[in-house]
Amino acid sequence: MPTLAQRATALLNVHPSHQFRRDRWFQIRYDLGYAAAGLAVLALVATGVVSPLFGAPAGWWLAAFPVALYVAIAAHLLVHNAGHGSFPRPWNRLAGELCGVLIAVRFVGWTLIHVRHHKYSDDRVDDPHPNFPSFLRTAIHSMLQVERQLMKAYYVQWGDTPENRAREQMRARVSYATTLLLFAAWGALLGPWFFVAVFLPAQLGAALFVIHFNWVTHNGHVGKDFAPVDQDTGWFWLGNRLFAGIYMHATHHERPYLFHPLFRNTPPRADAARDVLTAKSA
């Protein structure tokens, strides 16, 4: 019988995409665990065991916003890299989970969506975030596609049956509720004013940044020839230095194991030679 420590170690060394392929109930159990954690945080704050970090608005919050925005964008980047197994084990799972909670979308959902982006890149039906000449249309389409694409991923793995469709409808409701609970937990921890004035705008700004980066690195701003491209001039040059080569997207699609695509000739680590998303190995 494995000990609690052994179970924790095993969990930290497995990638969530592997758990998804082994257990048809995995996503629901996973989200229910985070929902319970969110409820626990809310209870701790409500009972006074934990106090909110910030109170009334203060002038220094203006300086805090760009820091919060940078952290939120970096969290998206690190969840992405953990999805590709770019960190050494067991830190890879830990980084993915922590950063996934920071942006409330969670590691598993982020990863499963990104699997489909690599597999169906620029396919208007199956890419979760295909690009259009209009950035606004691209942004709205991307935000509305998340649950639909998660359902498609499930049907590909487990079959498109009435039973599985009912299960996915339930999972989607659990997912929405869990996201709301995590945001509520952040609001309780940070305090309502800081949550509304700094945290939420930073989350929205980071989401739009990620959508925009994908748009310009698939020629969305050009309006034709939608495909991954590398960008490293002007503001893109700065973005690559601030966010680990984020705009070198063609290189990333070619060598997804790279933590920093600017350094394209970096050999993969022995434990990262497989790419867990594009299924180059198990």
Located regions from the model:
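Short, flexible segments with low predicted structural confidence
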Residues: 54-55, 86, 220-221
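Divalent metal-coordination and catalytic microenvironments
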Residues: 80, 114, 212, 218, ...
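Alpha-helical transmembrane anchor segments
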Residues: 201-245, 249
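Short, contiguous alpha-helical
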Residues: 250-257
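Polar-ligand-bearing catalytic/cofactor-coordination segments
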Residues: 221-224, 255, 272-273
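Non-catalytic, topology-defining segments of multipass membrane proteins
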Residues: 1-74, 78-83, 93, 97-200, ...
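Conserved protein kinase catalytic core
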Residues: 86, 224, 258
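Cytoplasmic-side transmembrane-helix entry/capping segments in multi-pass membrane proteins
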Residues: 89-90
